[in-house]
Amino acid sequence: MIKLNVKKFENQLLQRLRDLKISNKKVLLAVSTGVDSMVLLSGMLKLSKVLNVEINVAYIDHQLREQSKEETKFIKEFCFARNIPLYVYRWEKEEHPVQSIEAAAREVRYNFFEKVLKENNIEYLVTAHHGDDQAETFLMKLIRGGNIQQLQAIQSVRIFRENYQIVRPMLIFNKKEIYDYAKQLGIKYYEDETNKSDDYQRNRLRHHIIPVLKAENPEFLKHVLGYTQQLTNNLQVIQEVADVKLNKISKEETLDYDKFVKESPLWQRILLERYLEVKGLEIKETQVQQILAMLND
């Protein structure tokens, strides 16, 4: 078994953080005490002087697991020992919805992150999403169906709630590399018990589907990452062209009907979808078809 080169891992993380403009900045790390976020936190602490970054940590006690109390105590002690500003939110069980708990938990997390960013004048939220997350998310979207735009890769940087940026420097690493780094440096972390449950689609893919695909080709995850990035690049080019076209056929806040219907059916669809996206409107595929049919009737 090939041993992970710790120095190489840290140099790659350092270069990625520099590429993402995380130097001389005040940042907020989203930490769950899982292996991914603890490796990110530990790695950035080692690189903090070189990068000249001021690290802050946000942690949410979701009250979803037996060990959440122990995890909360651990992260408090970890940050206190290293003089790291820590912001904790406790999501009380009484506030948990009966259904769609994952979606609700995500909303709670990001509302809390925004609050901390705003109150502490921090622009960058750093998360520990990694390469395996990228592939799993792609497969989940593929199964769910919908607009091809939704199949784009998880972005290394994206705007968050208009005023902030989410930065994901760990996308260049796979899960095995992260585990290996934690093991070699003796980094303490907690395993989420729910990761073992097949009640969640991501876990079913991780436990049963992806291993079969990896058996067919060990480079499967790498190939998925390549395809999603190619798709993202191509869609971004189309979006840029669409924005130019939209400017030409827009009339104040609306589209110029006469100019719009002169476009090919393919471009009509692209322009309509882009127009609705810019306006912040989400509609179903059947509704897009109905609108296009009415416009061309």
Language-model segments: residues:
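AMP-forming adenylation/ATP pyrophosphatase catalytic core
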Residues: 9-36, 56, 91, 108, ...
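Short helix-capping/linker segments at secondary-structure and domain boundaries
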Residues: 51, 216-219, 277-284
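Broad structural signal for hydrophobic residues in well-ordered alpha-helices, predominantly aliphatic
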Residues: 116, 213, 275-276
